[in-house]
UniProtKB/Swiss-Prot annotation:
This is tRNA (guanine-N(7)-)-methyltransferase. It comes from the Bacteria. It holds the Pfam family Methyltransf_4. GO terms for cellular component: tRNA methyltransferase complex. Catalyzes the formation of N(7)-methylguanine at position 46 (m7G46) in tRNA. The active site is at 157. The gene is trmB.
Length: 254
């Protein structure tokens, strides 16, 4: 593999120009970000003050540096990566219900991370950390092999236009990368309310040999506690309002 665009990051900011992107050479499909601009957005004065005070401890920006998770969290515990945490409403609501686990929220959108940061600080939540960057690049560069007990991808952008399907995060290469970061027995949980994206995922459920596809148990007591969303996410709520069918997918690392 080849690293591309190694611009130096500044705290809390992404490097200028094309986003960091690894050129994988393993024959699998990986999301291609393309030449489009991410939503920048602005923070309120209060958000900016909280960001400046708390981000250095609770947040990191995408970098070519593997995280020492026990050091970052000040404890050794099962760690779950949530890829695409958005505004973090459900992340902040779930974290206190699983206080024994470490949660790493990965998101590109700074205002979304700022909202989550505010919820974490005001709620005195101690088990959430944040990384600003593309989910695939964060998995590739910042998590060691077999370092995660779970990965969550809840209601990812469906990129509905056919020419944009290459940007969908659920690809054969992404599943392979996630499998390499999961510990044996670790769980991958994906949820979507987009029918075409569900069909896309259906075609990939058996593609990664390191992952055992579990489907979605009819008996709710069989759902691994590690993956219990417990609260309705923002985009799940929008889907339910439109009477969309929620599809859930579970895999276990062999």
């Amino acid at each position: 593999m080849v690293w591309m665009n190694n611009s130096e990051n500044t705290p809390g900011s992404l490097p200028p120009g094309r986003p960091l992107q690894t050129e994988f050479n393993d024959g699998r499909d990986y999301p291609r970000l393309g030449n489009f601009s991410f939503r920048r957005g602005t923070l309120t004065d209060n958000q900016e003050a909280l960001w400046n005070e708390h981000w250095p401890k609770l947040g990191k920006v995408l970098a070519d540096e593997v995280i020492d998770l026990p050091e970052w969290f000040d404890r050794d515990a099962e760690t779950i990566a949530e890829i695409g945490s958005g505004t973090g409403t459900s992340t902040a609501a779930m974290a206190p219900l699983e206080a024994e686990k470490n949660i790493v929220a990965v998101e590109l959108y700074r205002p979304g991370l700022a909202k989550l940061l505010g919820s974490v600080v005001r709620g005195d939540i101690h088990n959430v950390r944040m990384i600003r960057g593309d989910g695939v690049e964060v998995l590739q560069r910042m998590f060691a092999p077999e370092s995660l007990s779970g990965v969550r991808i809840y209601f990812p952008d469906p990129w509905p236009k056919a020419r944009h399907h290459k940007r969908r995060i659920v690809q054969s290469g992404t599943l392979h990368l996630i499998a390499s970061r999961l510990k044996p027995g670790g769980i991958l949980h994906i949820a979507t309310d987009h029918a075409d994206y569900a069909e896309w995922i259906d075609e990939l459920v058996e593609v990664e040999e390191q992952l055992e596809y579990l489907g979605w148990p009819e008996d709710q007591s069989d759902i691994p506690q590690l993956t219990d969303r417990q609260v309705i996410t923002k985009f799940e709520g929008k889907g339910l309002d439109k009477e969309h069918i929620i599809r859930e997918y579970l895999w276990r690392k062999k």
